[in-house]
Amino acid sequence: NPYAFGL
């Protein structure tokens, strides 16, 4: 997810 660590 773009908002957390690129996960």
UniProtKB/Swiss-Prot annotation:
Q: Where in the cell is it found?
A: Secreted
Q: What's the chief localization of this chain?
A: secreted
PTM sites of type Leucine amide: 7
| Keywords tagged on the record | Amidation, Neuropeptide, Secreted
Q: Does the keyword Magnesium apply?
A: no
One record GO biological process: neuropeptide signaling pathway
| Highest taxon above the source species | Eukaryota
GO CC aspect terms: extracellular region
Per the record, the similarity remark reads:
Belongs to the allatostatin family.
General function of this protein:
May act as a neurotransmitter or neuromodulator.
Name the chain's protein: Carcinustatin-5
